[in-house]
Amino acid sequence: MSRTLVLVRHGQSEWNLKNLFTGWRDPGLTEQGHAEAKAAGQRLKAAGLKFDIAYTSALSRAQVTCQHILDELGQPGLETIRDQALNERDYGDLSGLNKDDARAKWGEEQVHIWRRSYDVPPPGGESLKDTGARVWPYYLHTIQPHVLREETVLVAAHGNSLRALIMALDGLTPEQILKQELNTGVPIIYRLNADSTVASKEILSA
């Protein structure tokens, strides 16, 4: 038995492809995104993993990614909890805008600050710090107890909600986490110690 947590960012979405701010909007996966999600499941299967429970967000791109992974593992009916606590960072007034159009409207420097600062939210939206303030407590109270019971847990979510988890798990500073890119459909496998600290981390890239 092992205390195993697997994090996967959803496969490429239609809006990733169009370079739009997505946030809590709900576009579907591209053909490539479906393939990325299935490939993630295949890599997890090759690694010999089976899950006891899965968590995902309230957004379909993460839910479909989660389902593809479970299908590839032969676990299509596994208990899966969907919760908006794991949703992507809310980009507020930027949601649905092309990133170049946003730069034209607010200026390149301001948009860069909204995208790449830790604690400055866009109008009507969340900063990465705000995102972490909902994601990390949900992890501690809901997900981590399963892992510490020596279960294997899947979390299929989003770039920034997963960044918030990785920042806390890895003990990173805001500056360090902002430099971390999470590729779509690439599983990250954490093994935890009994005291909830990280024993090992492995990235299952193609």
Curated annotation (Swiss-Prot):
A GO BP entry is: glycolytic process
User: GO molecular function: any one?
Assistant: phosphoglycerate mutase activity
Site Transition state stabilizer — annotated at H158
Q: What is its EC number?
A: 5.4.2.11
Q: Where does substrate bind?
A: 9-16, 22-23, 61, 88-91, 99, 115-116, 159-160
* Location of the active site: H10, E88
UniProt cross-references to SUPFAM superfamilies, sorted A to Z: Phosphoglycerate mutase-like
Q: Which domain of life is it from?
A: Bacteria
Q: In which pathway does it act?
A: Carbohydrate degradation; glycolysis; pyruvate from D-glyceraldehyde 3-phosphate: step 3/5
UniProt cross-references to InterPro entries, sorted A to Z: His_Pase_superF_clade-1 (IPR013078), His_PPase_superfam (IPR029033), PG/BPGM_mutase_AS (IPR001345), Phosphogly_mut1 (IPR005952)
Q: What class of enzyme is it?
A: isomerase
Pfam families reported for this sequence: His_Phos_1
Per the record's keyword annotation, is Isomerase included, yes or no?
yes
Task: Give UniProt keywords alphabetically.
Answer: Gluconeogenesis, Glycolysis, Isomerase
Which chemical reaction does it catalyze? (2R)-2-phosphoglycerate = (2R)-3-phosphoglycerate
* Family the UniProt entry places it in: Belongs to the phosphoglycerate mutase family. BPG-dependent PGAM subfamily.
| SUBUNIT field | Homodimer.
Describe the task this protein carries out.
Catalyzes the interconversion of 2-phosphoglycerate and 3-phosphoglycerate.
Its name, as the record gives it, is: 2,3-bisphosphoglycerate-dependent phosphoglycerate mutase
Q: Which organism is it from?
A: Brucella canis (strain ATCC 23365 / NCTC 10854 / RM-666)
